[in-house]
Amino acid sequence: MLGRLPMGLAGLAILLYVQSGTASFAVAGLISAVYMLGVAGIAPLIGRMIDRIGPRPLLILCALVYPAALVALVVLVEHAAHTGWLALAALVGGAVLPPITICIRTLLPRMLQDADLLQTAYSVDSILIESIFVAGPALIAFFVALEFRAGAVLFAAACALAGSVLFMRTPAIRLWPRPTAYQSRGLLGPLRNRRLSMLYMATVLYSTAFGVIEVAIMALATAQGRPAAGGVILALASVGSGIGALVYGSRAWAMPPQRQYVIAQFAMALGLFALAPVTHLVWLGVLCVIACSPMAPVIALQSVLVARFTPPAMLAESFTWAATALLGGVSLGIAVGGLIVDYQSPFAAMLAAGVSTLSAAALSAVALSAAAATEEKTAAAESAL
């Protein structure tokens, strides 16, 4: 948990800290987006290296460089450095975010052969991640209340260092399977798989909404003179998402996961459209608990489908491409959200988030329905034997 806390902390902390130093949501959105782009851009290479040499060398490297990059970003903001230098520090920091989540999600299908258990495990993991996204904004709100926004960025750096050290001492890492003989998989690797490619494209679309939502809610709270409330509302959104994952993971579903994935995305889009006209911060927080409940199930189902569509020797790289799609979408959403709230309104930004998620659902419905139908026919044929 400690080593994964920067996932729910660093991007938003950078956004608010840079905004306080530059007085611009557009610049802050750009720097936060560059950070997320660094995470997303290097992830496939990290995954390929994990498949090839195991996770320990990369965890050591990231545990050292990531805190240094975030400290450098704070120093640059304090000295009013050029935006280009801020972007460079953010890019390096994002590129070396410790790959703890990728390691965990790669281990799960190797440890659990039963499909229902794997679905439950990914749901539990999504709940843990959502708890991180609850704790992250809450901690940011604490630092904002103290008028020490840099503290949130520095705290993320410390968590990454301490968490990586602790994770490397766990039995799962010590007992990581010895990598098999390396097999060439080409430059694109998992992207050559059509189903995975379509899954990644849908992920970019719905995760763009995540980034837009962050900026829209923080901008709305800031405009009303209560920036700390924005962090609380985002934490409530994560609570709702975690409840959704708990409900989803508590039972076995007869419906194929491809169709579950599409339905969850449609539900998420409807929730975002419902939030768009709400401007009262208390009601927005309450409604976020309900409207955001499909978010974690969408992410859990994405992991189930990646594990289902991927050969075992390529699991880490496939999950890092999934992370690239997810974080790349968040990065795009933060940048676009910053522009929309600067030139339009938080209402327009929330509508854009809903449209992006609805597009993801439509793409998934077209791209994955054929795969679901094929699996149903195969299962029916096997049961008839």
Across the structure, where does each feature detected by a protein language model lie?
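Cytoplasmic helix-loop-helix junction between adjacent transmembrane helices
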Residues: 89-130
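Helix-loop boundary and gating motifs at the non-cytosolic
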Residues: 1-40, 190-235
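Intracellular juxtamembrane helix-capping segments at the cytosolic ends
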Residues: 14, 98-112, 217, 297-310
